[in-house]
């Protein structure tokens, strides 16, 4: 393994503006992917990792939650430029060793950009910043666990600690984490989904009874119409472009709804096909609606109004499976079209064209992401998407349904495993039945509540399972001040980030294994699992030796913290969970 190389920091002065692109991917994406992979990993590690990325016997990509094709239908290179870069960042040969931390004070590190911090490589040892210290220094694993346990058990109330989860944590780690936190005695389990698809989860739960997608990848391929609102797959979910290409080849139409005309929704040059290398690729969007910011609610109601006017409805489905249709019908019939135009920035002709495409389709898939969720009325907007699907019976049948496209690779799985500050009573009852303790029943802190509680001195311990809390959360200045006011911060991480530097009076960095690495426990080789955007759960096994012999897996770290904190309380066998998961 190469020693850590000092890298130049990122400079915004080097940014340039180029003409807008008219396509995504192509040979350039391959060249950039390979360049980054070879620079960060070298030829041998590049070959070993990328050949296993998103393969049935390999490891799951950490860059997004787009689903994998069924085994037997996957390409040899089943990854995108983003995925190759994410793997290169984790499987880098650079290392952030104790010598690195001795050389750089926390203030020095904090003066660098987030990009530079990540370029310093994998953290090799557990590290601690003691009260009043200027540098991180190594700490023994057992000493770290004892310190955490002493701080947690010394709290006046269990609710004075909060336990954050990033969507890259595995199902196994997430389950152990929430079990420990609830056995400890709190539901303070904020996670990254609080800041992205929380409005989706609420809207879908309140309308169709489950806060997840209702489609599979095959449904996307079989759709006659795909509506993509507030989402840019070319940048955020590039492998989705392959699915859209298949749908187009099968005759699908695509409507894109976004203020910007994103290159990835104009044309896709698939680098694994000749026409994507030397040809023009595949045209994607048939209609682009350049909507005003947050005009989506008005647009979806206007589309519903036209479908009602034309009686382009599935009355049998409405009668058998829905409630509240008449109220919705009367509401959309009474829309003021001048207000619709002001809200959407679209002409009536543009909206009519989109509605005619909906009218002509009996198999429609609706996709969306942050462009819909990140508004005060996000829940209401997403419910209008659901209303369109229900009005035409486009749910619960092949080639049709709802597809909230998730970002973090296991953000959906973490919620399934119980990472939620507002758990259902049925879930808590199941925990009680299985493990013999009565979990706390009061709702805990979400992300914003956690920030406020730290700011106000009501939370003094922060534990982060992955992620970069400081950079991911709203109101950065307030978040920084809140974290710096805590007594202890604990970060379970693979690489250096800002949240290690904006920390509590005492701070711990607990380095963990990544997706690309082998995981050997007492019972032998382990694998983890993740859940993608279409609710498919699959295994992940890394091919590489760990970046350092001092690393521990997420599950190992969490069960060790639980053992040190709870001992034999509740009779939960943490060791058995650690030895074989």
PLM regions with names:
Residues 1-59, 64:
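Intrinsically disordered, low-structural-confidence terminal and linker regions
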Residues 2-30, 121-409, 417, 431-581:
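Cofactor-pocket helix-loop regions in the catalytic cores of large enzyme subunits
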Residues 61-64, 80, 196:
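Disulfide-bonded cysteines in secreted/extracellular proteins and peptides
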Residues 63-66, 467:
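Short Cys/His-rich local motifs and their 1-3 flanking residues in nucleic-acid-associated proteins
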Residues 67-87:
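Iron-sulfur (Fe-S) cluster-binding segments and ferredoxin-like electron-carrier domains
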Residues 86-135, 145:
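Low-complexity, highly charged intrinsically disordered N-terminal segments
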Residues 418-422:
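Surface-exposed loop and adjacent secondary-structure segments within mature catalytic domains
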Residues 428:
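Acidic, glycine-rich segments within the central catalytic cores of soluble metabolic enzymes
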């Amino acid at each position: 393994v190469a020693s850590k190389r000092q890298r130049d920091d990122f400079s915004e002065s080097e940014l340039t503006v180029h003409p807008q692109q008219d396509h995504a991917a192509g040979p350039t994406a391959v060249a950039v992917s390979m360049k980054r992979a070879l620079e960060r990993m070298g030829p041998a590690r590049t070959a070993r990792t990328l050949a296993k990325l998103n393969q049935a016997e390999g490891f799951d990509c950490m860059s997004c939650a787009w689903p994998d094709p069924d085994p037997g239908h996957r390409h040899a290179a089943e990854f995108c430029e983003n995925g190759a870069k994410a793997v290169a960042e984790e499987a880098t040969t650079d290392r952030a060793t104790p010598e690195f931390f001795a050389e750089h004070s926390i203030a020095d590190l904090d003066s660098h950009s987030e990009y530079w911090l990540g370029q310093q490589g994998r953290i090799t040892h557990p590290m601690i910043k003691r009260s009043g210290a200027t540098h991180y220094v190594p700490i023994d694993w057992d000493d770290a666990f004892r310190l955490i346990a002493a701080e947690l058990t010394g709290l006046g109330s269990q609710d004075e600690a909060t336990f954050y989860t990033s969507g890259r944590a595995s199902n196994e780690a997430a389950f152990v984490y929430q079990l420990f936190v609830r056995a400890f005695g709190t539901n303070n389990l904020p996670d990254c989904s609080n800041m992205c698809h929380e409005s989706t989860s609420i809207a879908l739960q309140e309308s169709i009874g489950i806060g997840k997608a209702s489609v599979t990848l095959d449904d996307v391929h079989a759709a006659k119409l795909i509506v993509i609102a507030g989402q840019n797959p070319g940048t955020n979910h590039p492998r989705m472009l392959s699915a859209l290409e298949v749908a187009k080849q099968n005759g699908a139409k695509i409507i894109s709804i976004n203020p910007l005309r994103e290159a990835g929704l104009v044309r896709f040059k698939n680098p694994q096909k000749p026409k994507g290398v030397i040809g023009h690729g595949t045209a994607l969007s048939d209609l682009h609606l350049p909507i005003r910011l947050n005009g989506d609610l008005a647009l979806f109601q206007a589309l519903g109004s036209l479908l009602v006017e034309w009686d382009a409805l599935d009355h049998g489905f409405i009668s058998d499976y829905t409630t509240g249709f008449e109220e919705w019908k009367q509401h959309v019939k009474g829309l003021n079209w001048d207000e619709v135009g002001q809200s959407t920035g679209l002409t009536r002709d543009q909206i009519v064209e989109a509605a005619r495409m909906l009218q002509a389709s009996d198999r429609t898939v609706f996709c969306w992401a942050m462009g819909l969720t990140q508004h005060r009325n996000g829940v209401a907007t997403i419910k209008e998407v659901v209303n369109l699907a229900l009005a035409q019976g486009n749910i619960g049948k092949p080639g049709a349904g709802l597809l909230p496209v998730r970002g973090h690779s296991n953000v959906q799985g973490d919620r399934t495993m119980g990472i939620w500050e507002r758990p259902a009573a049925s879930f808590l009852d199941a925990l009680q039945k299985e493990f013999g303790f009565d979990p706390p029943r009061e709702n805990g802190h979400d992300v914003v509540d956690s920030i406020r509680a730290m700011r106000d001195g009501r939370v003094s311990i922060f534990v982060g399972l992955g992620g970069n809390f400081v950079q991911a959360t709203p109101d950065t200045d307030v978040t920084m001040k809140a974290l710096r006011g805590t007594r202890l911060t604990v970060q379970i991480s693979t690489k250096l980030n800002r949240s290690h530097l904006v920390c509590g009076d005492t701070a711990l960095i607990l380095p963990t294994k990544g997706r690309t690495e082998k995981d050997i426990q007492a019972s032998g080789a382990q694998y983890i699992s993740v859940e993608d955007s279409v609710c498919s759960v699959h295994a992940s096994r890394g091919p590489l030796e760990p970046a350092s012999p001092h690393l521990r897996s997420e599950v190992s770290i969490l069960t060790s913290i639980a053992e040190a904190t709870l001992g034999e309380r509740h009779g939960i066998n943490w060791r058995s969970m650690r030895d074989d998961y």
